[in-house]
Design a protein with these regions (language model features):
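Bacterial N-terminal signal peptides that target proteins for export
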Residues: 1-11
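C-terminal segment of classical bacterial N-terminal signal peptides
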Residues: 17-27
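N-terminal segment immediately downstream of the Sec signal-peptide cleavage site
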Residues: 26-79, 144-179
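Predominantly extracellular/secreted and cell-surface proteins with exposed
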Residues: 58-122
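Extended amphipathic ligand-handling, pore-lining, and cofactor/metal-binding catalytic surfaces
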Residues: 110-152
Length: 179
């Protein structure tokens, strides 16, 4: 596989995984919590079921129907780190990190594309705390594909059709962090 095809394939896989990797975080002033537990669940729109069915979750990530889930591994500042990966064909994207921007109410999701580097694959709109009590904090928002034209083109190339568009809504994301 030539370098261009590999980059496009990896970017596409990352984009599909990132959605699953999107997670919640504590405010930017929070101290690192390396033993934090929790889970991020991505619920893709049912119209994307044929695409989502091509994603293979790599443990500890899990896939079920149109949902992907990733365990939270730690919270550092405004970043929520996860473990697990997804594969689409020969492309693997792993260890999603959700970076929350509390000023805008949004977040970005980056994934490490194996063989390349970490890149933003998804954005989260209206990512807010939905509940916060002594035991857990729940963040929820709307998962969108990044506006990066290279990532969008990579997704479309992976599935062989012009399905994805920049900033396209993909579904919902919910991150639960146990305190």
């Amino acid at each position: 596989m030539n370098l261009t095809k590999k980059i496009v394939s990896l970017a596409a896989a990352a984009a599909l995984v990132a959605g699953a990797g999107a997670m919640a975080a504590t405010p930017a002033t929070a101290k690192p919590k390396p033993k934090t537990k929790g889970i991020t669940v991505i619920s893709f729109d049912k119209a994307l079921a044929p695409v989502v069915s091509k994603i293979v979750a790599v443990a500890p990530a899990k896939a079920s129907g149109t949902q992907l889930s990733f365990p939270v591994s730690k919270v550092v500042g405004n970043g929520v780190e996860h473990k697990g990966a997804i594969k689409v064909g020969a492309v693997e994207a792993k260890d999603p990190i959700i970076i929350i921007n509390t000023e805008t109410g949004g977040a970005s999701v980056t994934l490490e594309i194996v063989g390349l580097s970490r890149m933003e694959v998804f954005t989260i709109k209206n990512f807010k705390i939905r509940s916060d009590d002594k035991k857990k904090q729940v963040w929820q928002g709307f998962l969108h594909l990044t506006s990066d034209p290279i990532v969008v083109a990579a997704f479309n190339q992976q599935i062989g059709a012009e399905v994805f568009k920049a900033d396209m809504g993909l579904g919902q994301i919910r991150t639960t962090i146990n305190k």
